[in-house]
Amino acid sequence: MKYQLAIIGGGPAGYTAAEMAGKAGLSVVLFEKNNVGGVCLNEGCIPTKTLLYAAKVHDTALHASKYGVNVKEVSADLGKIIARKTKVVRKLVLGIKAKLTAQKVTLVQGEAYIQDAHTVRCGEELYECEQMIVCTGSATFIPPVAGLDSVNYWTHRDALDNKEIPSSLVIVGGGVIGMEFASFFHSLGVKVTVVEMMDEILGGMDKELSGLLRADYVKRGVKFLLNTKVTGVTQKEDGIEIEYTCGEEKNTVCAEKLLMSVGRRPVMSGFGLENLNLELTARGTVKVDEHLQSSVPGVYVCGDLNGVSLLAHTAVREAEVAVHHILGKTDAMSYRAIPGVVYTNPEIASVGCTEEALTREGRVYRVVSLPAAYSGRFVAENEGVNGVCKVLVGEDEEILGVHLLGNPASELIIQAGMMIEDRRKLSEWKKYVFPHPTVGEIFREL
């Protein structure tokens, strides 16, 4: 079987590329060994946001009296929350399959193996292709911890399918995944402890705002162990005992459940990638150019596999750029304004440079910061809740970075990223008319 384009991996990069190329008239074959949609749709972005929304509804009901609404009884049915999550995922997976079918994409459900730059094997079948996009994503990284193999610990996948609310939970890793699950389970009344090796949670976000978010959760009862390394775990009758060190101090913490969420690593083995002899970066990921083309002409690498930005929305844009290059259209990938969002309650979002990055690079900047209370809409909808809008501005008044704490940061960060991508100056925000009242009006107040 011969195709103009073969795509390995049906996650955000893979299905985006397949749909685009099919729509452009190319014959496309897409290989996916699990469910189309990848980790993001099936066990990542969408499932977690479905759970987090349920937790937010639960929080709203619990604290409804602040807004003059009396709710007598509030309880969470985790089984029903998980069932709804499954329904949402199934609906979106079917939607993607329908779009692929509409563009005449051949979807092969099975493990693909790359034999060379123009040949892919799946089972007993061989598929020839003129060009190839490889986007196999990433997998959960589990660090070597003494005793870990002997305890019934969770990964994010287990946490997403668990139907019983534990009494207590220790989360190893205070990154995006760890903090989102901390937010979810804390909202359901679970006693949560977060263990983080670094001196602050959410390493890639603005340090000041990350600290404010952590302080908010501390007030609500979440415990954080920073600068802390887990050295061993032991299964006990009533749960799991976690041994840890903080400096010279050794201690233990016990919980009913343990969630390991220290990060993810690109999937680079098991599908014949080595047969392509691709050039790698110093970090061991696949090296690509601004068109996402690897060192082998006609072979493109998108998403987590190239290691540049392990985010679903980055993968989607990379796929668009790769397909445009295949079609002979002018386009190039820019990582200048890739937004990052952590969907805790409240949300925290970031785009562009952080203060830490600018300081490392020796760049001159100033900070323009306002409390979210400058927005009437924010005050109306957030009783007793604080938020921050922080903008980093260069010597020429160009916007270098925007960092937000407070709902709905995930929606506001979009326009901030557009300003950074287009190299706009801070004063240019005042040229736009914002609907009133909206939280986004705060940008005009800067």
Put a short name on every predicted segment.
Residues G11, E32, G137-S138, C246, ...:
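Short glycine-/small-residue-rich Rossmann-like dinucleotide-binding loops
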